[in-house]
Amino acid sequence: MKKEFYNIAKLVTQNSKILDVGCGNGELMKYITENISKDIRGIELSKSNIQKCVEKGLTVIEGNAEIDLKQFPDSSFDFVILSQTLQAFLDPENVLNELLRIGKKAIVSIPNFGHWKVRLHLLLKGTMPVTENLPNEWYNTPNLHMCTIK
């Protein structure tokens, strides 16, 4: 499992109610289910990732977070997790506002496009790197916004 997922899981309290927005293949959800809280569900756009979640026995809703988060009542969850997904939204500010509305606490992580390894790769090879965290070629990416820590 990605180190980032362990760091996120450490922030979640035992037996809390959790929504994982853009849950991907369910790797983080599965870890949380087995170790922290059984009351977790995800929302995911990709049909293939939804299938992977279902195969793992996870509860997942097919949906677009930019539209479908509005359907949840205020303070529905103790934690709302958005991992490596914010940069792919057309209106990230609206998504963040929805996370704060439906969750008592929001945990957000982003890919750091300014990381020294990314910049070094760009300098030496002239291309954006393709890695586990940045798995797409620059011309075929869902990332609409490039994020850095500062």
Positions of the model-derived regions?
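Short conserved loop adjoining the S-adenosyl-L-methionine
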Residues: 68-74
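Class I SAM-dependent methyltransferase SAM/SAH-binding core
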Residues: 31-68
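S-adenosyl-L-methionine-dependent methyltransferase catalytic module, highlighting the catalytic core
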Residues: 93-101, 105-150
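Conserved alpha-helix/loop element of class I SAM-dependent methyltransferases that forms part
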Residues: 1-15
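Conserved beta-strand/loop positions that form the S-adenosyl-L-methionine
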Residues: 21
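A short SAM/SAH-binding and catalytic strip from SAM-dependent methyltransferases
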Residues: 79-90
